Amino acid sequence: MSSFTHFNEQGRAKMVDITEKEDTIRVAVAQTSVTVNKEIYEKMTNRMIEKGDVLAVAQVAGIMAAKKTSDLIPMCHPLMLKGVDIQFAWHVEEEKALYQLLITVTVKTKGSTGVEMEALTAASVCALTVYDMCKALDKGMVIGPTYLVEKSGGKSGHYQRENSSVGGFANEQ
């Protein structure tokens, strides 16, 4: 296992020097979910939430979060993102009263460090935005799990999550 790179010789935090790293195309895909009750599911799918179009607001919030990741996570490098795409899908099992919103975020750039944290941050903020906009109806919503599905580019190469189903969803690409 490799050592932690965010510590200096004194054992204190540092931002990793990426000056010498080669620019490559970097892609990261993250997923999370929000489990809601039937009332929220029906109101969201019919765009009847009083605060507005939940998915539209969550999508914009997620994109903004990806762009602001280095402001939120201390050792993240500020990146010039080339693309952020957020997809939503419902997983519904009426007989189990299960209503889960799957959020999939893809972040891309060309640079010298990866975009995993940007994808994970965007997915998390999307889910938090859904919660915020729906909490008046039910504070018992469940967020997560949140995880990296795939990443490519850079020295460490390609990563694909081995577990093909996390949180009840198959990894969809």
Curated annotation (Swiss-Prot):
Pathway per its UniProt entry is: Cofactor biosynthesis; molybdopterin biosynthesis
Q: Which reaction does it catalyse?
A: (8S)-3',8-cyclo-7,8-dihydroguanosine 5'-triphosphate = cyclic pyranopterin phosphate + diphosphate
Q: Which residues bind substrate?
A: 75-77, 117-118
Q: Tell me the enzyme class.
A: lyase
- Write out the entry's keywords from A to Z: Lyase, Molybdenum cofactor biosynthesis
Q: Which residues form the active site?
A: 132
Name any one GO molecular function.
GTP 3',8'-cyclase activity
Q: Where is this region: Disordered?
A: 152-173
Specify the domain of life of the species encoding this protein: Bacteria
Q: Where is the composition biased (Polar residues)?
A: 162-173
Q: What are its E.C. numbers?
A: 4.6.1.17
Q: Which residues cross the membrane?
A: none
Task: Show the Pfam families listed in the entry.
Answer: MoaC
Could you provide one GO biological process annotation from this protein's UniProt record? Answer: Mo-molybdopterin cofactor biosynthetic process
Q: What does this protein do?
A: Catalyzes the conversion of (8S)-3',8-cyclo-7,8-dihydroguanosine 5'-triphosphate to cyclic pyranopterin monophosphate (cPMP).
Binding partners and assembly: Homohexamer; trimer of dimers.
Q: Which family does it belong to?
A: Belongs to the MoaC family.
Listed HAMAP family? MoaC_B
Q: What is this protein called?
A: Cyclic pyranopterin monophosphate synthase
The organism's lineage? Bacteria, Bacillati, Bacillota, Bacilli, Bacillales
Gene designation per UniProt: moaC
